[in-house]
Amino acid sequence: MTTKFLYWHWEEFYDKKQIKTIHDLIQDKSYTKEDPDLAASPYEDGTPRKVVDTQLVNYREIEYAIRGIIDEAYTICLTQFGYTAKLPTNDDLHYNTYTSRKKSRYDYHIDEARENTHDYKLTLLINLSPKEYEGGDFYLFSSGNMMIPELKKPGSAI
């Protein structure tokens, strides 16, 4: 299937109240922090690509709060990109918190599985920041870097 889109976006899918509800739910239901050794592979010199606080939360625990965007993403995944995808309900979601104080960043990387039995076909990013921020631009690489401005708005998703 040929697609005319590199990505899809939903601007301000969640309002400030919903963002706070989801954030609070993740704080309550998160069960651990991501092991840095299991995060994105470091650069050849050992410098980490990912310097971010990442909490893990089971999808089942917050499904009711994010079901709307998940359903939208499944529909777009099928109708616009030609993939039939279904998130296993026992999968973990990553909640990344970026701060200027810690000089957080997640450098260029490719989303792929470490195992040969499966690979990622769909990544959904939701901006759950309670307010607008500077920096932290998100780029896709497709014949050159392309900034995705829609993700800057709180409550938006790509």
Regions found by a protein language model. Name each.
Residues 67-71, 75-158:
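Catalytic core of non-heme Fe(II) oxygenases with the double-stranded beta-helix
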Residues 1-86:
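Non-heme Fe(II)/2-oxoglutarate
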